Design a protein with these regions (language model features):
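N-terminal amphipathic/basic-hydrophobic helices that include classical n-h-c signal peptides
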Residues: 1-19
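Thiol-/selenol-based redox modules, centered on thioredoxin-like
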Residues: 123-126, 131-180
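Conserved helix-turn-beta segment immediately C-terminal to the redox Cys motif
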Residues: 43-44, 53, 57-80, 101-104
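N-terminal "domain-start" segment that seeds a small globular fold
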Residues: 13-38, 58, 122-123
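Thiol-based oxidoreductase modules, predominantly thioredoxin-like and allied folds used
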Residues: 74-91, 107-118
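Amphipathic alpha-helical repeat scaffolds
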Residues: 29, 49-53
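Short, internal strand/loop/helix patches
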Residues: 94-144
Length: 180
């Protein structure tokens, strides 16, 4: 045991052991095909757990507006459906895609439905939930439409679900995260 601890310490000191990054999380697109989050590594991202039957669902309009405004500048919204909050995303992948495209004209990428909290929490959200928001809250996602701005290189800024896509602080954070 002692030798193993010394070995681990030596590797950590040498910088060879690193914490998982959000880009390492395995996730699939909404259609079930594997996605590689490393494809987004040089971009500014807005990762949002989304739901179709929530009082905050109209935020899709603002999320799509951000995608249109900044998409050609190295930015993308990533929508991650979740059904953990009062069952407000009960649909199949096909139903979610149809709802988002026909009701809100969503063009940003949508990923598989995942758990953002609890025992079956997706590894992406294990990383994101460790980040505190401006009020110091870190931990479980509180509701649908919690937002995480990820700058190129992986720095994360967290915003609560009631922060709208048009919020000045959110927009300012996105603009600051855009690649040069």
């Amino acid at each position: 045991m002692f030798a193993r601890t010394q070995f681990d310490r030596a590797w950590a000191i040498a910088g060879m052991i690193r914490r998982m990054s959000i880009y390492d999380a395995a996730i699939s697109k909404l259609d079930g095909t594997p996605a590689d989050l490393h494809d987004y590594e040089g971009k500014a991202l807005l990762i949002v757990n989304v739901a179709s039957k929530c009082g905050l669902t109209p935020q899709y309009t603002g999320l799509e507006a951000l995608q249109k405004q900044y998409g050609d500048r190295g930015f993308s919204v990533l929508g991650v459906p979740c059904n953990q909050f009062m069952g407000q995303e009960p649909g199949t992948a096909e139903e979610i895609q149809t709802f988002c495209s026909t009701s809100y004209g969503v063009t940003f990428p949508l990923f598989e439905k995942v758990d953002v909290n609890g025992d079956a929490q997706h590894p992406l959200y294990k990383e994101l939930n460790a980040v505190a928001d401006a009020d110091g809250y870190a931990g479980d996602v509180r509701w649908n439409f919690e937002k995480f701005v990820v700058a190129p290189g992986g720095a994360v800024t967290r915003f609560g679900p009631k922060v709208t896509p048009e919020d000045a602080a959110l927009v300012s954070t996105i603009e600051a995260a855009l690649p040069a």
